[in-house]
Amino acid sequence: AKPRSNWAAAEDDRPLAATGKRQALASSRLFAAWAPSRIISSPWLRCVQTVTPYSVDYGVSVKEKKSLSEAGAQRHPARTARTVASLFDKDSSSLLCTHRPVLPQVMNVLREYLFEGSAEVLPTEDPYLEPGDALVLQVTEGDNPRIVSVERVRAALD
């Protein structure tokens, strides 16, 4: 995203910088390997810009959730937790986009779905992810979904 220090307008309107736009295009090709059939994103512009290339290229609509924005997560952390937990409700591949300040809440929910004794597979401190990074989670199917592996990925820029 454009640096906060260089942005005077509303935070939710802060767009991706040129590098972020290139990363979003490259990530679209990377995400295709997992074929997410649903996209859940913060409604803030830079998150929507991040998932739009995949959405357009593969015909998957974006469901915007205020609870994934920085302001929404700060105001209603329980809603944010429910939104993240909803990823485990269906036996389908999902793509979630949020903001770095929300990642501690996201990681707390993901830890609940780890097999006992495997907490070290998730990032534990800020920065949890660098700009352009993503976590890919492989999850068991069924009534009691569990994360079996976590892979940190970054799309290669052309």
What is each model feature region?
Residues 158:
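SAM/dcSAM-binding transferase cores
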Residues 91-93, 131-134:
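Active-site lining segments that contact anionic ligands and/or coordinate catalytic metals
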Residues 36, 91, 144-148:
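A broad structural signal for short, well-ordered beta-strand segments within beta-sheet-rich domains
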Residues 88-89, 97, 128:
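Extracellular/periplasmic catalytic domains that process cell-envelope and extracellular macromolecules
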Residues 78-92:
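A short, acidic, amphipathic alpha-helical segment used as a generic capping/interface helix at domain edges
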Residues 133-144:
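Short phosphate-coordinating micro-motif centered on Lys-Gly-acidic
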